[in-house]
Amino acid sequence: MDLGTTKYIIYTELIADGYVEKHDVIGAIFGQTEGLLSNELDLRDLQKSGRIGRIDVDLENINGKSFAKITLPSSLDKVETSILAATLETIDRVGPCFATVKITEVEDIRVSKRQYITNRARSILRKLMDEMIDTYEITEEIKESLRTEEIMEFGPENLPCGPNVVHSDSIIVVEGRADVLNLLRCGIKNTVAVEGTSVPKSIMDLTKKKTTTAFTDGDRGGELILKELLQTCDIDYVARAPYGKEVEGTSKKEIMKCLRAKVPVEQIVGNTCNDTCNVSKVIENRPEEIVEPITHKYYEKVETPVTEPVFEDEIVEEETVIVEPVKKTETEIIDVDATNEIQADKKFSGVKEIVDSIKNTGNVKFVVDGTEKTNTFKEFLTNIHEIKKMDFFAADMPISQKIVDLLYDKTPIIVGKEIHVTKKPVNLRLFSFDEIVA
């Protein structure tokens, strides 16, 4: 059915008591409605002028009766269409047979069109949004291409580096090209990569002339490269990516945090007693979110000006800071009468045995409801939210202020390899291993 300019469709059902044919039904519609209404609503005139469409009749003859479904398109307004529909119900004979006619529905075809328009518009919009390139993506794509163009080459080995490496007073040494690119994304342009575990001679010479920060991955590979750098280059500061992460996969916020937390190389060497820099053990015992940055046991925390990374075209002048060793002093934080108190107080019974059991293991041991439990420090931090109260806590590691702040309301006693805190809650007892075994 060609709807054309149709506004409404009248659906009608007709039942005749005898056998009739389609032309009988059409004749009855035109014949019995003729003259009922004014000439403006005469079906023949309306059809000639195109204001109503072709009348469709779907006829069936069953058991001596005839059943017809009649469809009449109308482009009249709703009032005239309603009058026309009511007129059809006045038909009472078709041919020689009695008949009844009933209007089943008058459909506003424009509603269907509006629904189609709505659904189709949704589909088109969804397709457009899927195909549309976001402005942010365009911006990032352009920035990425510019950053890639900014990567330069340094030395006869053609090492990837940032554009400010030659002119800056300070440099950051990383592992590979991807690390240089990630730091460029963060606006850090004084970076150069060693491209492997064998440090090129041009890097060795460059580190002698500039203040150098070694920034390596937080895994075993990063530790090996750091060892190589410390043995072959003149490194001033050391920074590590978060534990288990690579520099190339670290976010801008984490990179800035790591670079600001860099430590002088003297502290790294001191921590390992001038050994081949066993940094992994230090890092494993120092989760970033809890423990203070690495400090040598013969050094107090010293505020030192550190070099910020160079951003964009900015070149920062730096001074080499020498960390002087200072003598460890007794403070009121540590209980002076620790040995006598431990021997006198029953709640400290068994402490020496617990301390002996975790010495040189890097583990922690704590007592909950009379039950002793042993974990690595990392496992302990993971499950700490499940622990409400502890009778006792001991760790084969230095006790920092952050550990005290974390545990002061969970246990009355904390024992560690060393005590490095500035504030102690009144109801908390802090003991070092040396005091326990004295």
UniProtKB/Swiss-Prot annotation:
CDD domains: TOPRIM_primases (cd01029). Mg(2+) 2 binds at D217, D219. Forms a ternary complex with MCM helicase and DNA. The lineage of its organism: Archaea, Methanobacteriati, Methanobacteriota, Methanomada group, Methanococci. Keywords: DNA replication, DNA-directed RNA polymerase, Magnesium, Metal-binding, Nucleotidyltransferase, Primosome, Transcription, Transferase. GO terms for biological process: DNA replication, synthesis of primer. RNA polymerase that catalyzes the synthesis of short RNA molecules used as primers for DNA polymerase during DNA replication. SUPFAM superfamilies: DNA primase core. Residues 169-243 form the Toprim domain. This is DNA primase DnaG. The keyword Metal-binding applies. GO terms for molecular function: DNA-directed RNA polymerase activity; metal ion binding; poly(A) binding. It comes from Methanococcus maripaludis (strain C6 / ATCC BAA-1332). GO terms for cellular component: cytoplasm; DNA-directed RNA polymerase complex; exosome (RNase complex); primosome complex. It catalyses: ssDNA + n NTP = ssDNA/pppN(pN)n-1 hybrid + (n-1) diphosphate. It is an enzyme of class 2 (transferase). Belongs to the archaeal DnaG primase family. Mg(2+) 1 binds at E175, D217. It comes from the Archaea. Binds two Mg(2+) per subunit. Its cofactor is Mg(2+). Its EC number is 2.7.7.101.
